[in-house]
Amino acid sequence: MAELRHSSSLGSRSSSSPLRAAGDEDSSSPHVHDHSPNGGDDEDGRPRHPSRDRDRPIWFHSLFPFFGDDPRVSPQKNKISLLLILILAIASLISVYGIINHLNAPYLCKKDGIVLNCPHVKESPSPWENPLSATTSWKPCAERRIGGISDLPPENETNGYVFIHAEGGLNQQRIAICNAVAVAKIMNATLILPVLKQDQIWKDTTKFEDIFDVDHFIDYLKDDVRIVRDIPDWFTDKAELFSSIRRTVKNIPKYAAAQFYIDNVLPRIKEKKIMALKPFVDRLGYDNVPQEINRLRCRVNYHALKFLPEIEQMADSLVSRMRNRTGNPNPYMALHLRFEKGMVGLSFCDFVGTREEKVKMAEYRQKEWPRRFKNGSHLWQLALQKRKEGRCPLEPGEVAVILRAMGYPKETQIYVASGQVYGGQNRMAPLRNMFPNLVTKEDLAGKEELTTFRKHVTSLAALDFLVCLKSDVFVMTHGGNFAKLIIGARRYMGHRQKSIKPDKGLMSKSFGDPYMGWATFVEDVVVTHQTRTGLPEETFPNYDLWENPLTPCMCKA
């Protein structure tokens, strides 16, 4: 009956607040039974103040009823509420962890299709350097371990000797040397100092020791690969190594995997004890090679391969003169202008010119590349397609318009690294009119200073390489090993220096639009190139190791 009366009493006060009703009943009704052992007291026997329950909001009682004293709450509801608290706690921890991770995440641009998305930065854009906050997340980590213990076996205990001809120009040879060290490491072979093969175009007979510091090269890699200066004395017929098919591995595919060398080349080296690899242009891949081998290639490229001291010193002088041409220290831009006759011909692209120029270029192409030329009837459509795809070299005038749209003023000091430009001064006129301060190494140094370096074409190329490498802004106009190695080295040095890679495909559309105004063109150029400046980005699959060494060769700072 008491329980029935309790219910009736609650019902009669239904119009009042539940909390107030409960409080009133506790104080006035003689029929209310106290279910706690101490009646209206707390667990320690002291009277419980009614405001304790009133201070808790309604949502608290509904979500966490087991904190209250309501006997009507079932054990099942208590379990559900406990589970809810546990889920909320885990979600909170995950959220906090995600926020901390986001705050500590290194700056890294990521590609979504053809669009490169980069994290937002607070700094105002600068024409001369990348934002500081975008360049502090990564550091080089391919240098050799100081005080490390070498696990290399003695020279007579390696699997044999490997020998390569480094073909092409200076930069192609540089890549071949890096790959040769990596291949020797993969096969645990001794590397014979690579021979720089005479280039058919440059007719240069430079030896390794004429351009690179051999002692530093061998010493820096002494814990990685066994390197000897010459073919061992016990191998008497040295001419055989240069010409004999029996001593040459010729079937190495381009961008071969490390496993290919272990399965196909190593057995022949073990059998013959000394083998030449030929040809050796781009004969080692990137993403099919262990990370430690890719890191070794960076070690060779950025640390072991140093130019001779006299080349380094002359380059430093050119850089200093370039910065101080106006009497005050100023930043300078380096422009790799690839518009030589050979490059224009090989591209099979169509360029502005007179009818006579076009006829002569057609004759030149037919002579140099007869199989590709055929009868010439298909070349026009091919040229249009290549231009749309961004596969044609930028003309000097096009480069000038792009740089002006990016905001570089007329007074900009520009170092030009280039061979003889196809079309001569007439072709260079638009660029020189917009940027009159165009400078070459011949303008910065006297004839006597360059005499020593003229003995070897590769020495002159090395000077261009170093002056471009140390510039505040580097601009490429077409692909190639020179630009690729420059951009990669500047990234490895910290991403701070801008390395601009024009989007030639998009620019061809803008140049070909007769209705596009200057303001719209400027906006297109700025938006397109704001992330094409050598910012941190994963190496694979968008880049090879030489243009972007981040993934295998750089660590979080």
Curated annotation (Swiss-Prot):
Q: Which residues lie on this side of the membrane: Cytoplasmic?
A: 1-79
Name the pathway it acts in: Glycan metabolism; pectin biosynthesis
According to the UniProt record, one GO cellular component term is:
endosome
Query: Which sequence ranges are marked TM in the entry?
Result: 80-100
Q: Name the residue ranges with Low complexity bias.
A: 7-20
A GO molecular function assigned to this protein is:
glycosyltransferase activity
- How does the protein associate with the membrane? Single-pass type II membrane protein
What residues bear carbohydrate chains?
A: N156, N188, N324, N375
Matching Pfam families = O-FucT
Q: Which domain of life is it from?
A: Eukaryota
Q: What is its EC number?
A: 2.4.1.-
Please name every pair of cysteines joined by a disulfide bond in this record.
Answer: none
Major localisation: Golgi
Q: Name one GO biological process term.
A: cell wall pectin biosynthetic process
Q: Which family does it belong to?
A: Belongs to the glycosyltransferase GT106 family.
Q: What else is known?
A: Overexpression of PAGR positively affects the biosynthesis of type-II arabinogalactans.
This one is known as Protein PECTIC ARABINOGALACTAN SYNTHESIS-RELATED
